[in-house]
């Protein structure tokens, strides 16, 4: 595998990407999973950090300025890449996501999306990654992958796509989920 450790410039881009994701995620958290009309009726325009409202089962336990599992999984992905000197190892990514999920009780608090939850439970119970069904048609992989676009070289499109695909495998193996992640990372 190629070494894709980031340069100083790439590190700055990755940090900017992570900060942007965390801030945007925390800003949007109160309206998580709500349709546009409900968001407008409840909040009007969201222009500052707000706590998750008690009426929103997806956000009711979040404090103002707290980001969601999307950013936590993004950080777990970056930790796995750093641990492996830039090599995209799906099992290392899964391990880091599971460490975060257990640390914050993501399974018990129902923080994870349905696809991530099912895949991570299967992995934790010892099911091999290649035996987990490719049923992840949700957007969880796309939500965590943006910094890979700052890190990966783009000259070799096939290599780029393969690295993003590998990053998706722990939770989202379907073609549509992988395609969405590639678009975000690109």
Predicted segments — roles?
Residues 1-186:
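Structured, active/binding-site neighborhoods that engage oxygen-rich ligands
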């Amino acid at each position: 595998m190629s070494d894709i450790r980031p340069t100083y410039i790439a590190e700055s881009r990755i940090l900017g990407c992570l900060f942007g994701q965390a801030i945007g995620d925390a800003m949007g958290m109160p309206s998580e999973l709500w349709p546009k009309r409900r968001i407008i009726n409840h909040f009007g325009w969201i222009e500052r950090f707000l706590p998750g409202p008690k009426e929103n089962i997806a956000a009711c336990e979040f404090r103002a300025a707290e980001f969601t599992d999307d950013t936590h999984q993004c950080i777990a992905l970056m930790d796995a890449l750093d641990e492996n000197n830039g090599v995209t190892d799906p099992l290392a990514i899964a391990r880091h996501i599971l460490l975060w999920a257990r640390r914050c009780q993501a399974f018990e608090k129902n923080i994870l999306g349905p696809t991530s939850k099912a895949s991570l439970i299967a992995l934790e119970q010892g099911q091999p990654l290649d035996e987990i069904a490719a049923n992840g048609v949700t957007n969880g992989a796309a939500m965590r992958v943006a910094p890979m676009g700052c890190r990966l070289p783009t000259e070799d499109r096939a290599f780029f796509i393969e690295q993003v695909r590998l990053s998706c495998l722990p939770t989202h193996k379907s073609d549509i989920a992988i395609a969405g992640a590639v678009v975000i990372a690109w």
